[in-house]
Amino acid sequence: MVAPSQFKQLEKVGNGTYATVYKGLNKTTGVYVALKEVKLDSEEGTPSTAIREISLMKELKHDNIVRLFDVIHTENKLTLVFEFMDNDLKKFMDNRNKGNSHKGLEMDLVKYFQWQLLQGVAFCHENRILHRDLKPQNLLINNRGQLKLGDFGLARAFGIPVNTFSSEVVTLWYRAPDVLMGSRNYCTSIDIWSCGCILAEMIMGKPLFPGSNDEEQLKLIFDTMGTPVEQTWPQVTQLAKYNPLLPPHMPRDLKQLLQNNTEEVLDDNVVDLLHGLLQLNPDARLSAKDALNHPWFAEYNHAN
């Protein structure tokens, strides 16, 4: 543990789901850091599981994961010291959209960001860690164009909150249909669904499934991807929140949907990858490793 006095707190840079984030300066090294302050319940203190999970994060060292340098534990707060990143994917896309109604990113950039996202996710899954809350706000970007997963492990350490003490609304837009229908079998496939939603959003410049509650979220998903049935998703009807009165929908043409929202001509490979990430049945979704070996990433795989 380092002394809090080693860091100088600079301007506030945001409210996260769990914490307030400040830009900070390591007075010893002169390096900028992000100081994430988690207020602790004075009666309950810090859950030991949270400390354990956060300690695990310190061991996650990968180019596409934001480094957690240290944890400072004082009586009423926990300060997590992260590497400082200049931007996040949501702000990056919003800035590109200024003056435009909706405009996706250039496909070369989409591919570069998606490759980095999947690299980070694959590394975490290999280490048996789920993110559970992947969304553009949690994908941090530095001025060299490196994309890194942020808030890794925090969703597990503190639970995904239903309501938060910050102005940020916990979004359902990237949440997998199995989770929305009450599945308790959280596994790596929930992060893969989120990766698919993020890929579509980078292409279109707007969220693929912008629902405002669980029910509407599922409706939007099934309207586009088709209504699940036992043949394509065994035991879907056993899920706690499965609705037997769901109107049957056939899957829509995903390529057409994306193409209508982008000026670039999409190749079939990116659409095929998206189908692999957005399988309704979690067991049918690609793994992060398989996704990285997809033909859409051929140029990256040949370069390595």
UniProtKB/Swiss-Prot annotation:
Function: When phosphate concentrations are high it phosphorylates the PHO4 transcription factor thus establishing repression.
Binding positions for ATP per the UniProt entry: 13-21, 36
Enzyme Commission number(s) of this protein: 2.7.11.22
Residues at the catalytic site: 133 (proton acceptor)
First and last residue of the signal peptide: none
Catalytic activity: L-seryl-[protein] + ATP = O-phospho-L-seryl-[protein] + ADP + H(+); L-threonyl-[protein] + ATP = O-phospho-L-threonyl-[protein] + ADP + H(+)
Disulfide bond positions: none
Pfam families assigned: Pkinase
Parts forming coiled coils: none
Domain of life (superkingdom): Eukaryota
Sorted UniProt keywords: ATP-binding, Kinase, Nucleotide-binding, Serine/threonine-protein kinase, Transferase
Listed GO MF terms: ATP binding; cyclin-dependent protein serine/threonine kinase activity; protein serine kinase activity
Stored InterPro entries: CDK, Kinase-like_dom_sf, Prot_kinase_dom, Protein_kinase_ATP_BS, Ser/Thr_kinase_AS
Protein name: Negative regulator of the PHO system
Gene3D superfamilies referenced in this protein's UniProt entry, alphabetically: Phosphorylase Kinase, domain 1, Transferase(Phosphotransferase) domain 1
GO cellular component: cytoplasm; nucleus; serine/threonine protein kinase complex
Similarity comment: family membership: Belongs to the protein kinase superfamily. CMGC Ser/Thr protein kinase family. CDC2/CDKX subfamily.
